[in-house]
């Protein structure tokens, strides 16, 4: 990384941290009095869009989106490739309102955790995989019924560029049981915002939104088949926009990161 890009990256982190502090402080006082959708727009959507703008202007990371016509009118379960922090910012600012799966322990962090709780996340206990799946099913279904998108990273963690992690069935199970489709999303954000290290590299991220996929039937077999279709689409699309994919050999993730 060049000296200029290193300076731009440091500046990006400084501005992002400062904006998070200011926005977080304002949100702590304003968010509790707002209804959920207005709260989401103020606390999450606006700041995440600012973060993406900052990424473009300061770090030189742009993006292009294909497949906008595939987004269904009714919120459903989003199954996204996970390579970096960028897609969390982008998807949170793009889909509204959106509920994410997170570790339950984060809700106990003073101020930060309390603010998260106001955004109605899906809090799970990752130390107990079976319980986590039940929590995802229950809380996720409640979010969908209230008209919120549910974002799941089925690989369970950020996967290095050029690799694919095995998809957990938690997201497809949630969709099938709710009678809704899954919306697969592929992107190559990790090429410019790597999982490891602090460096950011200028370039254009390709985001591809796939066709909404419905299950054929019900039950475990339908869940597994839908999961395979979603995983295959993401893998094939990643091969088009990113280096050749290589399967990551690790146990199937319990739910998500």
Swiss-Prot record:
GO molecular function: 1-acylglycerol-3-phosphate O-acyltransferase activity; lysophosphatidic acid acyltransferase activity
Localisation: Cell inner membrane
GO biological process, one term: phospholipid biosynthetic process
Keyword Nucleotide-binding: no
Purpose of the protein: Converts lysophosphatidic acid (LPA) into phosphatidic acid by incorporating acyl moiety at the 2 position.
Domain notes: The HXXXXD motif is essential for acyltransferase activity and may constitute the binding site for the phosphate moiety of the glycerol-3-phosphate.
Membrane spanning residue stretches: 10-30, 105-125
Species the sequence originates in: Pseudomonas aeruginosa (strain ATCC 15692 / DSM 22644 / CIP 104116 / JCM 14847 / LMG 12228 / 1C / PRS 101 / PAO1)
Pfam families: Acyltransferase (PF01553)
Main location: membrane
Alphabetized SUPFAM superfamilies for the sequence: Glycerol-3-phosphate (1)-acyltransferase (SSF69593)
Recorded GO CC terms: plasma membrane
Annotated pathway: Phospholipid metabolism; CDP-diacylglycerol biosynthesis; CDP-diacylglycerol from sn-glycerol 3-phosphate: step 2/3
Gene for this chain: lptA
Protein name: 1-acyl-sn-glycerol-3-phosphate acyltransferase
